[in-house]
Amino acid sequence: MSLFSRLSTWYFSKKSLPYWGIILLDCCLILFSALLVYTLNNGVLSTLDILGHLLVTLLVCLIPYLVGFRLFHTYSGIIRYSSFVDLQKVGFAVLFGLICVVVFQTLTDFSPYLVYIRKRDLILSALLAMSLMWMMRVFVKFFYVSTFRVAKAERAFIYGVKQGGVSLAKSIQNQDPARFVLAGFISDIAEIEYRYLMGVKVYPNDEELVSVMRKKRSNVLLVSPLKVEAIRNNQEMVDRLIKANIKIYMTPAAQEWDGRSDLSHTQLREVNIEDLLPRDKIEIDLEAVRKQLTGKRILITGAAGSIGSEIVRQVAQFAPERMVLIDQAETPLHDVRLMMARGWPDIESYTVVSDICVRERMEELFEEHRPDYVFHAAAYKHVPMMEDNPEESVRNNVDGTRVIADLAVKYGTRKFVMVSTDKAVNPTNVMGCSKRICEIYVQSLDQAIKDGKVRGRTQFVTTRFGNVLGSNGSVIPLFKEQIKRGGPVTVTHKDIIRFFMLIPEACKLVLEAGTMGNGGEIFVFDMGKPVRIVDLAERMIRLSGVKGIEIRFTGLRDGEKLYEEVLNEDETSKPTFHPKIKIAQVRAYDYADANLRIDALVQACAVEGDMQIVKRMKEIVPEFKSQHSKYEVLDE
């Protein structure tokens, strides 16, 4: 290693030079500049003859420059991070020193012991000194950036050239140590393609994107906040990047970024598959929801589950008076309790460990708290589990819903919002059928109240949607775990497709539907574009960077469909004022008949076997046709 390399390594290993070190360097540059200018104008021999007196003169002249350094704090910055502001401070300090020296010389004509220096030489030496001080700072910064700060940094392109992209670029340029080095921008705007921005070229977003990134030795794409939605909905671009093993990092989406504050590189995170699935931005009428929920008493069942806990979070933001949170899973409910204490300590909240099927306990809660709104998210949801345990599906899903619905009517709840599923449409499994029976019960009860057959004021609203990303036991966490173990990734069928929605987005629509509903509606959500599960698995494998992972087809599970629906063939829908929510026009049921049939079904669970229970369910829901299940014999 050369002496220069050793010195530079030693210097940059320090946090910064001490104040006195920076001042000493600047003073040396001023003295050098003055000596050089004087020598060039008066000759070497003449300078050597008076060198002693000249040095004394220059040291005296240095005093006002030192005062200027103190006034403008030129020494307080870290040289390797010098900016235009630091150069400006140096300029002001040198100008101050020059003016003081010229004024001093004019007023005193220098003492007999000092050498007279012409004003022209004073000005030239000051300009040279200022230039050298600037050059020293720029050189140190450039050398540090090009050699030390970016030694282990990855070359990255930024997708997006507007405010978000520029803010992100500034942030990564100020990282220390550098995580990324800016290699270029990607733009969808034709007018600025191949121009330069912040010293790098802007490239078009076309089929040559991967090739361009390879030429620039980059395998990282940073997505600006304003382009998050664009990349999600450009699946062709995403596929090209994933196949080329380009790492994609995202910042907060535009709705999470205020558009004014600078983005921080710490906000960048490598994408998950959930980030890249196509979906539309969902906005709801927050003011309408706020008017309904603020200052009200809210009861939420299944409050510790994936959907329930997100409903808790979203409802809490509207400052209700009281929240009663029910779940039979103690540990996750404790987590919800801690979340409420930490995030919303001013809301009166009660976490209740209980089974919703225990009518006596539920009645105690309704009598004590008398909720204005009930969000009913409690349910068993795993299809294979419910195929094996139909009596529990009936007990928890059907009878539990009936208990909560009846008590809501008895204690004057204004609105009851039930979370249903697309598996309730043309059900092929026990779980889906149990949820369809729940829909039938709350709809018929709502109509009975409207017809005056049941006394009460409660409005019953049902929300029906499909798979949510990241929920407990869903396919994405399963695939992640299988990839982590090295495979194989198991898919039930090569043609199976599903709709996906983020949990927060689904819960937003639940709140919106709950506030817009007048009772008796089944709201169905627009779930966006369907996703082939095998394509999802392939993407996740590529995104992980792990090679050689097999995808194994295991066959459809008991009761599993190839595709899900939100309406059956006899149902139609009509639009609402929200583009993502429609109202299903479904067959009406008589409340007394539905209640009688459900009574018989619940009682049968205590004395009859699985086949008899499922047979009764099929009598209530004639469109329930079992698939890949032992119950198919009942359809013959």
Please give the residue ranges for each predicted region.
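A solvent-exposed beta-alpha-beta segment
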Residues: 40, 44-46, 140-258, 331-335, ...
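Conserved Rossmann-fold cofactor-binding substructure of NAD(P)-dependent oxidoreductases
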Residues: 353-373
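NAD(P)-cofactor binding segment of oxidoreductase domains
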Residues: 232-249, 322-329, 368, 388-415
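N-terminal Rossmann NAD(P)H-binding glycine-rich loop of SDR-like oxidoreductase domains
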Residues: 298-316
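Conserved Rossmann-fold NAD(P)-dependent oxidoreductase catalytic core, especially the SDR/UDP-sugar
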Residues: 258-260, 376, 382-383, 387-440, ...
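Flexible, Lys/Arg-rich cytosolic regulatory linkers and terminal tails that connect or flank
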Residues: 4, 234-297, 409
